[in-house]
């Protein structure tokens, strides 16, 4: 077991052991590190979002198996077993973007277990899990170590939970191993709970009446609930992963709008507060603390006049001049807690505040929250940490589990059965044909043929009219531009300066508009149902595109989902830190720049997670999903070719063919 204070180098050593820090850009390496054995190594990182590679649950677990050349016939049993071992009972095609942080962490652990590693490296693997999840993972890891004889290296600040499993404890400090006993005190006994109760006051600070919460503003999460928090009271939101603790916490903080019911903070709706007014009464720490920072140094974040004093109380003195995003996870959380628990707040809302904290940071957290309660602040924290709840004497509000359900069912369409490459050909062939000429006949025939096929193509495509809007707008604007400024011929209808509307310009405008519709409509409708994963499978298996290039691109697309989530949380914190009243341009620029920086960090972590699951180890891969190109798919290509041939043929037969080139 690796332990030590935040920033001591535990995660770096874990990555080195996993063999994923080889590039010169990763840092300077001195000495030698030898890992015996050629079997796969499993690595689970701290942040769940940084290691979800694929868009669907089973595909994500299969990722490492494909890279390791595991036969497809063996994958299903491995995937099912690994997911069962971590208690993640979801549909095979359940979108990974809809998982909570704890569910993502279970998925990452399942991905590592499925590879049957000889060396399993876990970097704070259970910090985001609910108690049932922690117990299930601990039992699974214990069984694997016992039955399979794998070597386990675990990084955790809570050594007690691993006391029955680890044989040796290594303590790091400032990147060096320091002498420590084989069984330090924290392995044998947890800090005694003090059950300290706070002198609550009568006044109600926060209340929720018939509150219905929603993350996306459209789908209700759980049942309506009622809640009241008084001054000086600490309330812990509990419940399993995915129960809605984060959503409820951010709704209570005035950062998310309720779907129903009402939230009242000091007699007012917190959602109606200005950003500055809200920041003066509410302090917020998100689950990922990096979203809390807006300045280039810890000193500037804390305020230069009070930085030394606050940094000393939170153990941040040695890093005052460091950039907040360069800190370790535990250091970032301590800084975020320091920022949220300043003077003036009446309510603190904390999402997993003890996650990634070392023993010193945890002790400071407990002291600070107790002091805040004694001063009359209301404290709401979403947490899985039983010991923290016990030490704080918090009142628990337990959210029931929310049924995961099945993956969203959408109406079936003929497009769902088509190979993506066939659909690509069906859209590309008529487009190439129409690009060879610009005339009214070919464009008109093509639009008529496409229109006749819309009932077949658009069946099962939701909101296809909305999807077509960009094409229609492009068509309309192009037609107007050419009608006013195109080459004039024939009868002149209107002339004013550079504007000339003639018979020829109107004919050309109509032909251009119809051609844009004829080219754009099939592409939009055909690709509206193409799944990115199926398209990647078709490219690698049917088109023989480079495997690693295709999969890397697919992982990059999934990163957009993570970045979209980052943008949402960042916007919460812009409001929570009192910066949401600025002009739209300044807010957008601020959020965009930070998201860009976070995206770079995310991509680095994602690349590390992919490498840990054998990505790039072999030139070829096996495939969990088989991409087929049955005979019926040639009908799509034939249909596209027919549209192109009939359109151009009609123009030639009528003498209207107007070659674009030559």
Please report, for each region that a protein language model flagged, where it lies by residue.
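The feature captures the beta-strand-to-loop junction immediately N-terminal to the Walker
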Residues: 3-5, 238-240
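Helix-to-loop junction immediately C-terminal to a conserved catalytic motif
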Residues: 18, 253
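Conserved ABC transporter NBD signature motif
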Residues: 26-39, 261-269, 278
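Conserved ABC ATPase "signature" region
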Residues: 74-91, 307-319, 338
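Conserved ABC ATPase signature
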Residues: 95-99, 103, 323-327, 331
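ABC ATPase C-loop
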Residues: 112-113, 340-341
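Catalytic Walker B motif of ABC-type/P-loop ATPase nucleotide-binding domains
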Residues: 120-124, 348-352
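Transmembrane alpha-helix interface motif
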Residues: 408-442, 446-452, 565-662
């Amino acid at each position: 077991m690796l332990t030590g204070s935040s920033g001591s180098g535990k995660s770096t050593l874990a990555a080195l052991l996993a063999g994923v820090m080889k590039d010169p850009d990763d840092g300077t390496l001195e000495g030698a590190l030898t890992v015996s054995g050629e079997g796969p190594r499993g690595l689970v990182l701290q942040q769940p979002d940084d290691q979800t590679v694929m868009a669907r649950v089973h595909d994500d677990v299969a990722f490492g198996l494909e890279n390791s050349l595991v036969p497809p016939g063996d994958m299903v049993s491995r995937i099912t077993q690994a997911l069962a071992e971590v208690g993640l009972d979801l549909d095979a095609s359940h979108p990974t973007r809809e998982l909570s942080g704890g569910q993502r962490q279970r998925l990452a652990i399942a991905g590592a277990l499925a590879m049957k590693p000889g060396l399993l490296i876990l970097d704070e693997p259970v910090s985001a899990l609910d108690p049932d999840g922690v117990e299930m993972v601990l039992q699974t890891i214990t069984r694997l170590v016992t039955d399979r004889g794998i070597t386990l290296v675990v990084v955790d600040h809570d050594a007690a939970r691993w006391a029955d499993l680890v044989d040796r404890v290594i303590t790091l400090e400032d990147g060096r191993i320091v002498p420590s006993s084989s069984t330090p005190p924290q392995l044998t006994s947890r800090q005694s709970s003090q059950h300290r109760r706070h002198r609550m006051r009568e006044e109600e600070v926060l209340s929720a009446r018939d509150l219905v919460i929603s993350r996306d503003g459209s789908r209700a999460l759980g049942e309506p609930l009622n809640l009241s928090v008084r001054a000086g009271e600490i309330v812990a939101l509990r419940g399993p992963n995915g129960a809605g603790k984060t959503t409820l916490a951010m709704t209570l903080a005035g950062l998310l709008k309720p779907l129903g019911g009402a939230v009242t903070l000091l007699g007012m709706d917190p959602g109606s507060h200005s950003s500055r007014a809200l920041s003066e009464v509410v302090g917020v720490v998100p689950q990922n603390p990096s979203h809390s920072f807006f300045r280039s140094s810890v000193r500037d974040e804390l305020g230069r006049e009070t930085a030394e004093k606050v940094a000393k109380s939170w153990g941040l003195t040695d890093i005052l001049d460091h950039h907040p995003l360069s800190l370790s996870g535990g250091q970032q959380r301590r800084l975020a807690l320091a920022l949220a628990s300043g003077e003036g707040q009446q309510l603190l809302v904390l999402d997993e505040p003890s996650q990634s904290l070392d023993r010193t940071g945890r002790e400071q957290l407990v002291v600070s929250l107790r002091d805040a309660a004694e001063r009359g602040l209301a404290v709401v924290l979403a947490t899985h940490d039983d010991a923290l709840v016990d030490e704080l004497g918090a009142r628990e509000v337990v959210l029931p589990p929310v049924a995961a359900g099945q993956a969203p069912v959408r109406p079936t369409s003929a497009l769902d059965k088509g190979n993506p490459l066939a659909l690509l050909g069906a859209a590309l062939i008529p487009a190439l044909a129409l690009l060879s000429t610009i005339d009214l006949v070919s464009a008109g025939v093509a639009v008529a043929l496409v229109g006749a096929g819309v009932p077949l193509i658009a069946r099962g495509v939701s909101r296809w009219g909305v999807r077509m809007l960009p094409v229609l707008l492009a068509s309309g604007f192009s037609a107007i531009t050419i009608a006013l400024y195109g080459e004039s011929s024939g009868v002149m209808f209107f002339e004013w300066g550079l504007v000339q509307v003639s018979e020829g310009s109107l004919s050309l405008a109509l032909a251009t508009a119809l051609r844009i519709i004829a080219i754009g409509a099939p592409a939009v409708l055909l690709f509206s149902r193409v799944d990115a994963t199926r398209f990647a499978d078709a490219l690698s298996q049917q088109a023989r595109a480079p495997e690693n290039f295709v999969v890397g691109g697919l992982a990059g697309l999934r990163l957009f989902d993570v970045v979209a989530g980052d943008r949402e949380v960042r916007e919460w914190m812009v409001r929570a830190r009192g910066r949401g009243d600025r002009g739209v341009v300044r807010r957008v620029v601020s959020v965009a720049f930070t998201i860009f920086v976070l995206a770079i960090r995310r991509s680095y972590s994602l690349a590390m997670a992919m490498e840990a699951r054998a990505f790039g180890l072999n030139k070829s891969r096996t495939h969990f999903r088989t991409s087929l190109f049955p005979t019926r798919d040639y009908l799509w290509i034939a249909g596209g070719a027919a549209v192109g041939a009939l359109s151009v043929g009609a123009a030639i037969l009528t003498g209207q063919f107007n070659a674009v080139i030559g």
